[in-house]
Amino acid sequence: MELEFQQLDLRYERLRARQPARERRLLASLADAGQQMPIVVVIGPSAYVVVDGHKRVRCLRQLHRDTVAAVRWEMSEADALIFRQLLHTEATASALEQGWLLRALHEDHGLALDALARRFDRSVSWVSRRVSLVRKRPVPRLGWRFAE
């Protein structure tokens, strides 16, 4: 499906760190070859909630595109976030990014720490440590950047 940018809810963009070098490479690829992979969305109360593809959305906006190709997953936001994390296996996700996601699932979606541990095949202690790591740190509004 093709969606216009104003139809998108980017609330989870802040859970991922920005990596300017990777973003520049993606921008060049999108300018050269167009969008090759759709973003992933779920239906929210008033918009399509972007679960995966925030970097593609930012780059397509910079290229002044009007729409973005998207695929809709038929599941809850929480299930979609967990599935995306497991699908990508997130070898590159930092402990802070993992903590922000787990905190959002725990606080915003009401999932218990033991339920999160089972879903991610981790110990309750691991989940608790990740959540504690970010509990006193506010989630950045626009994402944070890794140094290059």
Q: How should these model regions be labeled?
A:
Residues 15-17, 58-136, 144-145:
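Amphipathic, charge-rich alpha-helical segments that serve as recognition/docking helices
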Residues 36-41, 128, 135-139, 148:
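Short, proline-centered helix/strand-breaking motifs
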Residues 1-73:
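Short, charged/polar connector segments at secondary-structure boundaries
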